[in-house]
């Protein structure tokens, strides 16, 4: 069964935790070979035994043996369409008769990942609710739970609601009312709503701090089920987490509270069955492409982990099961980020890395002639693959994005080269210099620009959003990723203080700062970038970009899954999620 090799692969191959292995660059003075990999914690992999990947041939055999069983699983669950119709009918009834419960119903579809079936019904419910509740005066007559839920759903769907609606829950002292401390349900939803804040919305900062402190303080006195539910929401707020991951816990929260809960749970399970079969088929396609490419044979030390490459695409596009072609094609770009990262970390001398970068900048096969054969093969195959991706986009969407795609690879290799020069020079850059370069070397721009084009955006069609309109959104995601990468790798006990992470660059500039203070500063920067990301996401309120925006947010949302380390520096939470998405 495919479940067997997935479990084996998860146990022996460490899952990715960033879009670049550069958790840090080691400071060294050896310019003949830049063996930085020996000093660093992999950003793509949660630290552990990097030499334990199963032999490619065995993995490929395991995949091929299951093609027949996978094709059998691809059949739709019994009465799948009937369950969708039943749920749609229930949602319509609630939308007509119970405004508040209809919002709870909508939230449940989002949390369980089945909202894609009911976009029309959800939009109508939100439209009606917004028309009647957007005024702070009207909100005065609703509970904390109701106002918080309304606020969050509206902001998530591009409808502006002023944070002033929460002033109704403050007393004469200007602080949140004491009686709210007993409203656990309301406080949880207030905490969730505060995750949608923009910069400068002080009341939402107060709301987050107030709700978090009270809920944390009350956890010990809660019943087991409630304590587990509240703890999960504090750790993984819905807006900043992957819906399918948090939805597993929400399934328990529904309980028997609503008559539609059972139907919705059943549909979510059917959906998951369909998604698993699709993901497994896609993984076979990725494995076939990877093995036919054969680059891991040329690059003996390159990571032979198609499962990891695919994990990124699967999670980023988890909300859109119909985008199968995009997931497979995006995985190819992820694979080359891995490969080129290994080129810069393990293979090249500084002179060779300069030639490699120039060849990519020229996008010219002949510019690779003086490179070693393995580096030459990697560069030429990159050009072939990205040219092929561009051609597929042209055939499907009618425009050729090759210039945009080439630009991302040029920028990535140039950023990698900057790191190599830093490493060779033996000095750390300033914190700002580091962050500006590292947000590019993260690979986030490569992935998101390729995804943008694969989704048919930025073409010549009237009203299409332009790639430049997404730059601030991409920048915030890249910074969030970079900082979390460095925060996660800072747990590595082998760090010596000379590695190139943001924390060490920042501490170099603030010599009296403790490690804990530097850590807190980085967390504050992450929080600021989430506020900026919220605003940019809200401003990109264009129908054509909604799927891309959700996928981009999912890239940022992967972070809490990646950095839930155990004592072995593994990521059991991410492993658990991937198992859940791919196998029973």
Curated annotation (Swiss-Prot):
Gene3D superfamilies documented for this protein: Farnesyl Diphosphate Synthase, Terpene synthase, N-terminal domain
Entry comment describing in which tissues the protein is expressed: Accumulates at low levels in flowers; mostly expressed in both upper and lower petal lobes, and, to a lower extent, in tube and stamens.
Top-tier EC class: lyase
Catalysed reaction, written as an equation: (2E)-geranyl diphosphate = tricyclene + diphosphate; (2E)-geranyl diphosphate = beta-myrcene + diphosphate
Annotated pathway: Secondary metabolite biosynthesis; terpenoid biosynthesis
Motif (DDXXD motif): 341-345
Gene Ontology molecular-function annotations: magnesium ion binding; myrcene synthase activity; terpene synthase activity; tricyclene synthase activity
Disulfide bond among keywords: no
Glycosylation sites: 30, 209, 322, 387, 468, 512
InterPro entries associated with the record: Isoprenoid_synthase_dom_sf, Terpene_cyclase-like_1_C, Terpene_synth_N, Terpene_synth_N_sf, Terpene_synthase-like, Terpene_synthase_metal-bd, Terpenoid_cyclase/PrenylTrfase
Transit peptide residues according to the UniProt entry: 1-45
Location in or out of the cell: Plastid, Chloroplast stroma
Record-linked Pfam families: Terpene_synth (PF01397), Terpene_synth_C (PF03936)
Reported cofactor(s): Mg(2+); Mn(2+)
Domain of life: Eukaryota
GO BP terms: terpenoid biosynthetic process
Binding site for Mg(2+) 3: 485, 489, 493
Enzyme Commission numbers on file: 4.2.3.105, 4.2.3.15
Cofactor remark: Binds 3 Mg(2+) or Mn(2+) ions per subunit.
Entry domain remark: The Asp-Asp-Xaa-Xaa-Asp/Glu (DDXXD/E) motif is important for the catalytic activity, presumably through binding to Mg(2+).
Family according to the record: Belongs to the terpene synthase family. Tpsg subfamily.
Function: May contribute to floral scent emission.
Name used for this protein in its record: Tricyclene synthase 1e20, chloroplastic
Species annotation: Antirrhinum majus (Garden snapdragon)
């Amino acid at each position: 069964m495919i479940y067997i090799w997935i479990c084996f692969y998860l146990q022996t191959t460490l899952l990715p935790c960033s879009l670049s292995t550069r958790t840090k660059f080691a400071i060294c003075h050896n310019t003949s070979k830049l063996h930085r990999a020996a000093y660093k914690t992999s950003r793509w992999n949660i630290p552990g035994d990097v030499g334990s990947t199963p032999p490619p041939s065995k993995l490929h055999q395991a995949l091929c043996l299951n093609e027949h069983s996978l094709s059998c699983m691809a059949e739709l669950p019994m009465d799948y369409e009937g369950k969708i119709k039943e749920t749609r009918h229930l949602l319509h009834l609630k939308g007509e008769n119970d405004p508040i419960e209809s919002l709870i119903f909508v939230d449940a579809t989002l949390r369980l990942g089945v909202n894609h079936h009911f976009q029309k019904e959800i939009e109508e419910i939100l439209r009606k609710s917004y028309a009647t509740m957007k005024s702070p005066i009207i909100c005065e007559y609703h509970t904390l739970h109701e106002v918080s839920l309304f606020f969050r759903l509206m902001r998530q769907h591009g409808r502006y609601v002023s944070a002033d609606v929460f002033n109704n829950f403050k007393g004469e002292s200007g602080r949140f009312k004491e009686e709210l401390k007993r409203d656990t349900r309301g406080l949880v939803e207030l905490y969730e709503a505060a995750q949608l804040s923009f910069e400068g919305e002080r009341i939402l900062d107060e709301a987050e701090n107030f709700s978090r402190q009270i809920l944390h303080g009350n956890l010990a006195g809660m019943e087991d089920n409630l304590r587990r539910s509240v703890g999960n929401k504090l750790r993984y707020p819905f807006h900043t987490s992957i819906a399918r991951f948090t939805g597993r816990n929400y399934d328990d929260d529904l309980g028997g509270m609503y008559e539609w809960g059972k139907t919705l749970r059943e549909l979510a399970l059917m959906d998951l069955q369909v998604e698993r079969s699709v993901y497994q088929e896609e993984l076979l396609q990725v494995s076939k492409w990877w093995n036919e490419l054969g680059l891991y044979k040329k690059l003996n030390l390159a990571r032979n982990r198609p499962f990891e490459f695919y994990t990124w695409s699967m999670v980023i596009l988890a909300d859109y099961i119909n985008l199968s072609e995009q997931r497979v094609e995006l995985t190819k770009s992820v694979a080359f980020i891995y490969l080129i990262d290994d080129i810069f970390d393990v293979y090249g001398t500084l002179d060779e890395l300069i030639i490699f970068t120039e060849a990519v900048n020229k996008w010219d096969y002949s510019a690779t002639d003086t490179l070693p054969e393995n580096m030459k093969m990697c560069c030429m195959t990159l050009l072939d693959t990205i040219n092929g991706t561009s051609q597929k986009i042209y055939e499907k969407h009618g425009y050729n994005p090759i210039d945009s795609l080439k630009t991302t690879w040029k920028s990535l290799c140039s950023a990698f080269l900057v790191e190599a020069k830093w490493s060779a020079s033996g000095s750390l850059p300033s914190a700002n210099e580091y962050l500006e370069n590292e947000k590019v070397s993260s690979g986030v721009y490569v992935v998101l620009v390729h995804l943008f084009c694969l989704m048919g955006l930025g073409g010549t069609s009237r009203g299409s959003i332009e790639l430049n309109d997404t730059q601030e959104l991409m920048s915030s995601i890249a910074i969030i990723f970079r900082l979390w990468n460095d925060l996660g790798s800072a747990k590595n006990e082998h760090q010596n203080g000379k590695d190139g992470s943001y924390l060490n660059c920042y501490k170099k500039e603030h010599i009296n700062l403790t490690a804990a203070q530097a850590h807190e500063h980085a967390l504050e920067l992450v929080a600021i970038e989430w506020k900026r990301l919220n605003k940019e996401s809200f401003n990109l309120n264009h129908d054509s970009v909604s799927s891309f925006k959700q996928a981009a947010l999912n890239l940022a949302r992967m972070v809490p899954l990646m950095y839930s380390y155990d004592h072995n520096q593994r990521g059991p939470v991410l492993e658990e999620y991937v198992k859940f998405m791919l196998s029973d």
